[in-house]
Amino acid sequence: LVPFLGRTLGGLLARF
């Protein structure tokens, strides 16, 4: 998996 996906998921979790 590309780091972009991981970073996106991390950002979403951070918002919540």
UniProtKB/Swiss-Prot annotation:
An example GO CC term for this entry is:
extracellular region
Write out the annotated subcellular location.
Secreted
Q: Which residues carry this modification: Phenylalanine amide?
A: 16
Gene Ontology annotations of biological process type:
defense response to bacterium; innate immune response
Report which superkingdom the organism of origin falls in.
Answer: Eukaryota
Its function, per the record, reads: Antimicrobial peptide.
Question: What name is this protein filed under?
Answer: Temporin-1Ts
